[in-house]
């Protein structure tokens, strides 16, 4: 699961993922986090 700090970051992450870019790469580029659970940490609700 990915968690992003803003809607803009979420959009950037999603666009990054479209061609099949690995999740960790897109998370690093967009400022999002990849978590193993179901709940995002505070400040990463998008």
From Swiss-Prot:
Superkingdom per UniProt: Eukaryota
- Principal subcellular localization: secreted
Q: What InterPro entries would the database entry show?
A: Thionin (IPR001010), Thionin-like_sf (IPR036391)
A GO BP annotation? defense response
Q: Where in the cell is it found?
A: Secreted
> What pairs make up the disulfide bonds?
3-40, 4-32, 16-26
Q: Which GO terms describe its cellular component?
A: extracellular region
Assigned keywords, A-Z: Disulfide bond, Plant defense, Secreted, Toxin
Summarizing the function annotation, the protein's role is: Thionins are small plant proteins which are toxic to animal cells. They seem to exert their toxic effect at the level of the cell membrane. Their precise function is not known.
Q: Which family does it belong to?
A: Belongs to the plant thionin (TC 1.C.44) family.
> What's this protein's name?
Denclatoxin-B
């Amino acid at each position: 699961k990915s968690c992003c700090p803003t809607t803009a970051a979420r959009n950037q992450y999603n666009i990054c993922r479209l061609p099949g870019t690995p999740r960790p790469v897109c998370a690093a580029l967009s400022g999002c986090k990849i978590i193993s659970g179901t709940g995002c940490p505070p400040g990463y609700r998008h």
